[in-house]
């Protein structure tokens, strides 16, 4: 082989390698596969380390926590630093957490911020990016209740933002009911500071409420729906079910993640397991990887 032929072949191989590499990168998932740990709360209570190991084998990489004990300063029986070390050793991460902020609506600012400080410190120790307001208690499902809520969300959001973290509100079905001619979530979108208060869309509750489609909801606050909860709805009872076993066709309803502003998503199933919570987590991620992941 003469030198010119060698150079041409080497150039061709290099070009093919570059194209192949670019193709591989374009097919590489942008987001880690996340799970809201409430889905496997029974297993986490019994043996959190073994549970995390099993979830990793299934393919889960990132988690959203729940149930931080502010009095004992513990996640699943571990201090934030201990839990972070466990995650690091397993090659896993957390990016968000649901905290008991919904019980603080009528606390004084001092007590509210004291509680919030504990959540912030724990979240920072884990290396999280988001603190999430999980739900609005039933007694506040009214126009006056949402007026108080947006005030509290702004207060909490401003403080959390100053800490270097982000704050988000998680929707339920009642957030799509009308309160003085507007949906509850519309009041939140319009009356909270978008720099302080982001949004976590729970697609199950959007579809169950049946008041607005996910893509139209995202259009109400483009770029602000930073977190997603992905789960399915039983075709008959409308209860939770494993992904792929229910009525939600994500190929038709899933919004554009770029328009949403998506940063993290989490699979979730709050109950109604076909066998048990870990089996359901496996069924859901298997279906997700086959049918939904490519849409995100």
What are these regions (language model features)?
Residues 40-46, 66-79, 102-113, 138-147, ...:
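Acidic-and-aromatic substrate-binding clefts and catalytic sites of carbohydrate-active enzymes
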Residues 10-12, 16, 22, 105-198:
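Active-site acidic/histidine proton-transfer and metal-coordination neighborhood
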Residues 47-50, 77-83, 114-119, 182-186, ...:
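Alpha-helical scaffolding within the catalytic cores
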Residues 35-39, 65-67, 96-101, 133-135, ...:
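A cross-domain feature marking catalytic cores of carbohydrate-active enzymes
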Residues 266-273, 281-283:
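Structured C-terminal subdomain patch of bacterial secreted/periplasmic proteins
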Residues 246-268:
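H/E-rich (His + Asp/Glu) clusters that bind or coordinate divalent metals
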Residues 2-129, 223, 282-296:
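N-terminal pre-domain/capping segments
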Residues 62-63, 160-247, 259:
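Acidic/histidine-rich catalytic cores of soluble enzymes
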